[in-house]
Amino acid sequence: MLAIISPAKTLDFESAVKNFPVSQPHFTDYSEQLIEVCRKLSPQDLSSLMSISDKLAGLNAARFAEWTKIHNENNSRPALFAFKGDVYTGLDADSLSEDDVIFAQSHLRMLSGLYGLLKPLDLMQPYRLEMGTKLANPKGKDLYAFWGNVITQAVQQAIDEQGDNVLVNLASDEYYKSVKESQINAKIIKPVFLDNKNGKYKVISFYAKKARGLMCRYIIQHHLTEIEQLKEFDLGGYWFDSASSTETEFVFKRDINE
């Protein structure tokens, strides 16, 4: 079983990280090409392209300038502990055991606009480059054109290494679009998280993001290997609703206590 999630805009390169055997990101040749494109953009260009403040644009221009293909523990940190934000709040990597993190290294991948696909312990440097960014590059008009089949093939390879042909899609639509589903040889399960608010069950973005992280945590902590085991997910007060689910879309519901 392989789970995929989105990265996060919020990063943490300050707090202490447990000592794990780190790995190298696989697609730094590609990352370097994107960095070269981004370095040609002024902070004003970045502000417009990414719809961010002048302050954030300046920060990210500096990050692009400082980025280097060489990743070590002085300039980088493992992706699992670098990303913060709603999904990663639910995942809560800092509280995972060593065995859990080792399991995650084989069973979890993070999609990335700059790095393509990251294993949890792959080193990464601070950056902001969302997959949906319309960054013109030598391969096309956006990052989907840039990455082409590269991410899809890497995801398939990771699935093949599991041996059970199961992909759990916990990524946002923006990031999952970088995976060409028609080319994936696996049973793809998409968990959907609905919260009851004012008498109706619906997707509430903040809660859904955190729930995707909770599901990752559940898979990792319980070392899941079977599709049916996903239905037992109960973190955060969610429960599996078989009546609303299909063979490939697993619906989990929760009643919010106001």
UniProtKB/Swiss-Prot annotation:
Any GO BP annotation: response to hydroperoxide
InterPro entries given in the database record: YaaA
GO (cellular component) term, any one: cytosol
Family to which this protein belongs: Belongs to the UPF0246 family.
Entries under NCBIfam families matching the protein: PRK02101.1-1 (NF002541), PRK02101.1-3 (NF002542)
Entries under PANTHER family matching the protein: PEROXIDE STRESS RESISTANCE PROTEIN YAAA, PEROXIDE STRESS RESPONSE PROTEIN YAAA
Protein name: UPF0246 protein HI_0984
Organism name: Haemophilus influenzae (strain ATCC 51907 / DSM 11121 / KW20 / Rd)
